[in-house]
Amino acid sequence: MPVITLPDGSQRHYDHAVSPLDVALDIGPGLAKACIAGRVDGELIDASDKIDTDAQLAIITAKDDAGLEIIRHSCAHLLGHAIKQLWPDTKMAIGPVIDNGFYYDVDIDRTLTQEDIELLEKRMHELADTDYDVIKKKVSWQEARDAFAARGETYKIAILDENISHDDRPGLYHHEEYIDMCRGPHVPNMRFCHHFKLQKTSGAYWRGDSKNKMLQRIYGTAWADKKQLASYLQRLEEASKRDHRKIGKQLDLYHMQEEAPGMVFWHNDGWTIFRELEAFVRMKLKSYQYQEVKGPFMMDRVMWEKTGHWDNYKEAMFTTSSENREYCIKPMNCPGHVQIFNQGLKSYRDLPLRMAEFGSCHRNEPSGSLHGLMRVRGFTQDDAHIFCTEEQVRDEVNSCIKMVYDMYSTFGFEKIVVKLSTRPEKRIGSDEMWDRAEADLAAALTENNIEFAYQPGEGAFYGPKIEFTLHDCLDRAWQCGTVQLDFSLPGRLSASYVGESNERQVPVMIHRAILGSMERFIGILTEEFAGFFPTWLAPVQVVIINITDSQSDYVNELTQKLQEAGIRVKADLRNEKIGFKIREHTLRRVPYMLVCGDKEVEAGKVAVRTRRGKDLGSLDVSEVISKLQQEIRSRSLHQLEV
């Protein structure tokens, strides 16, 4: 009979099979009331599942990340319960957990309106408020199929037919009269599911295939308590104010249009930001001793067959043909960089060779997934590939890590979550090679005093990788940086160098990205700064404003001085009230407004005002220029003080 070992090392002995809920009740009524599920020997199980062998058990509550995920998953079932009561002919597809919430894809014979969503949410609350028990039953495959056939649930039947073995015993979760199928676990009672909000709807193809029927996807968020929900909704409201699509339009940075889905039309001010960011990256490339190259944006399909992309990635590639040859527009830069490496004989003395490119790449992303600058079809990668020997891997990874943190700190990103993905089951190379590669990556992180978590089995088949996920001011996660070892591509494309023993050897290739894509990173920065770009990035850094026509010559003279000093400046000589002009440029997030009246002209000064409304007083022009140059040169995140 089972001996249950708890996280504190204490043990409880039973003469019969017990569930996590039984053990929680044995410990105390408070824990039993809070028990959502159990973690048995590392595996999550339902609170009602029986344990009949010796095991380690942790009781999962709403305070645990796993508990919150279970709450969200059960809220998806609650949505299904409610929608079937309101519109019984609805057919349920899939309802997984996502970041901060859940969704459910439904096949319903009406276009869901905002009023429908509000009605659905109300019914969900009414059901949850009854605190009904959720009953789990393990049944045979045929029993599950019969249950869904009786309810006309064609999508559930398809899941059973295509994804579940006839020998399996699927879990059916009974929410009163509503039944759903899931691996689980789920909450034992709906008292855990009171704090949720339905958010929006969108279209989604069944199985993600555009050849299939378009379903309606209903999104929601769910939390453990009222305070967490309110805090999240407040963050969402702030995120809406910072939406890069809104700010991009307000500041005239770029636009997208139907004739070129997922492609960016950069306007002058947006392109100025792009070029400044590019110049910053280019400066860092020089300091870290990279070559900058430029490969073709299109190559023969034969090349992509050699790399393996044609077999594994062709659905995401744009193609064209000419003179009976088929070409692929590149989705990534790496094959082109190997071709550059292959030109001319390379010696071990030439390594490491660090090759970077602002590569124009295109990927055929589904139209429904496109989202402003964050998800596009045409993008520019700040991509680099390092060709080195196995002995050089550790030092090169070390350098990559330093470069990542060096660049992120410039933008004020301090919270960076790092994960090391290790060997998958299907992989190339020997265990010894993987041992060394994983050890090199871990050692480089440790040498830089970086905390990281392992992701076992999540590496690519051709090598382990480090992922850098930065968190913005709203604590949203953006996976941008990657350091990926590649033991496959150089060999596939016949890359080699002459080693110390005068024999040809295949180099190790390190894929390195920091920003990820220029477009997406500009989107992230737009939201991080809410359009208040630091002065060095701002499209217009200074506007000089006259009060009356009598200061026009002085304004023009100052404008020329600032331009000659390398400052992006505009003169506003319009016949408008000074308050109107200041308000307009403040809304345009121009960092500094220099106001010139008769007093300033006479004294050879300017009245300096920041976009945040701070009055810095009347300053000498030379002092203003010097301080602005210093702020821009240092890429400061803070505006000047007097």
Swiss-Prot record:
EC number: 6.1.1.3
Pfam family, one: tRNA-synt_2b
Keyword Ligase: yes
Keywords annotated in UniProt: Aminoacyl-tRNA synthetase, ATP-binding, Cytoplasm, Ligase, Metal-binding, Nucleotide-binding, Protein biosynthesis, RNA-binding, tRNA-binding, Zinc
Subcellular location: Cytoplasm
Residue ranges of every copy of the TGS domain listed in the record: 1-61
Enzyme class, broadest EC rank: ligase
GO biological process per UniProt: threonyl-tRNA aminoacylation
This protein's GO CC annotations: cytosol
Annotated binding of Zn(2+), by residue: 334, 385, 511
InterPro entries (UniProt xref): aa-tRNA-synt_IIb, aa-tRNA-synth_II, aa-tRNA-synth_II/BPL/LPL, Anticodon-bd, Anticodon-bd_dom_sf, Beta-grasp_dom_sf, TGS, TGS-like
Molecular function GO labels: ATP binding; metal ion binding; threonine-tRNA ligase activity; tRNA binding
Signal peptide bounds: none
Catalytic activity: tRNA(Thr) + L-threonine + ATP = L-threonyl-tRNA(Thr) + AMP + diphosphate + H(+)
Taxonomy, superkingdom: Bacteria
PANTHER family (UniProt xref): THREONINE--TRNA LIGASE, CHLOROPLASTIC_MITOCHONDRIAL 2 (PTHR11451:SF44), THREONINE-TRNA LIGASE (PTHR11451)
Function recorded in the entry: Catalyzes the attachment of threonine to tRNA(Thr) in a two-step reaction: L-threonine is first activated by ATP to form Thr-AMP and then transferred to the acceptor end of tRNA(Thr). Also edits incorrectly charged L-seryl-tRNA(Thr).
Protein name stated in the entry: Threonine--tRNA ligase
Record gene name: thrS
